[in-house]
Amino acid sequence: MAGTAQGVQTQDVIKISATSGLTPAPQARDHKVEIAKLIDVSTCIGCKACQVGCSEWNDIRSDINAQCVGVYDNPVDLDAKAWTVMRFNEVEENDRLEWLIRKDGCMHCTEPGCLKACPAPGAIIQYANGIVDFQSDKCIGCGYCIAGCPFNIPRMNPEDNRVYKCTLCVDRVSVGQEPACVKTCPTGAIRFGSKEEMKIYAEQRVADLKSRGYENAGLYDPPGVGGTHVMYVLHHADKPELYNGLPKDPQIDLSVTLWKDVLKPVAAVAMGGLALAEVAHYLTVGPNVEEDVEDHHHEFEENKPSKGENNE
């Protein structure tokens, strides 16, 4: 995808965690090409080369031997040292047994729930090209990003109490290279480029699948999170849950939206109003509370009857 490389070299931040409309994040200086990774599950063979490529490039090692329980999934789940995992499912569709394989990892949502939920300033950022990246040095280990993710992706590392996930190889993409998983895929099931290019290619793959009898083939790019920068071509796009629980209509939890978009701004306005009221009080009344007390004391002493008067 050499033609896309120039458009994704500059990493401009457009969103930062723990900001709101009252404290807006910086915006990209100009338009940057939105990138996307397209995973065609119909051509994936489950070889796990992408897992190895991710592990090698990011220098992370999950304790896979401890998790091997007689299944193909190994490691059996994402963790702080396994940012991509192959999911294997046997399903019966149209009286046929099908073997569905899906590469699982961060979806890099256009409207990321993790970023919206994060209370730590700068711990999660989103670039103009769509990549959502965690800044581990600013993570406070609260785990709110885990609760805010509709795909259940981020994982806490018990060793340093910080959260990690796939970065979409932002370090490679920023210098015009493709992600490590794309580089290592032997069948071309994982592709990378501008989102527009990937959607055009996905249309071709969907048309091919439909011509082969998969009537409900389609592109998985859920609108509930504004679309994603990791997309899937699925045989059964009408039933994404068949692919190891891929959510059909993922959305940011209402409690997160209510907290960040309603309650937090209202609280900020209330605090601002209180500050203005204090300033107004200072300007109109003045900071003479202690002086008033002292004045009343002097006035009391002056008006206090003498001992002779009391005796009378």
Swiss-Prot record:
Compartment(s): Cell membrane
Annotated binding of [4Fe-4S] cluster 4, by residue: 118, 139, 142, 145
Organism superkingdom: Bacteria
Cofactor(s) needed for function: [4Fe-4S] cluster
Cofactor info, note text: Binds 4 [4Fe-4S] clusters per subunit.
Pfam families with a match to the protein in the record: Fer4_11 (PF13247), Form-deh_trans (PF09163)
GO cellular component, one term: plasma membrane
Residues noted as binding [4Fe-4S] cluster 2 in the record, renumbered to the chain: 54, 166, 169, 181
Domain 4Fe-4S ferredoxin-type: 35-65, 97-129, 130-159, 164-195
Binding site for [4Fe-4S] cluster 3: 106, 109, 114, 149
Listed PANTHER family: FORMATE DEHYDROGENASE, NITRATE-INDUCIBLE, IRON-SULFUR SUBUNIT
Role according to the record: Allows to use formate as major electron donor during aerobic respiration. The beta chain is an electron transfer unit containing 4 cysteine clusters involved in the formation of iron-sulfur centers. Electrons are transferred from the gamma chain to the molybdenum cofactor of the alpha subunit.
Quaternary structure and interacting proteins, as annotated: Formate dehydrogenase is a membrane-bound complex, formed by subunits alpha, beta and gamma.
UniProt protein name: Formate dehydrogenase iron-sulfur subunit
Encoding gene (name): fdxH
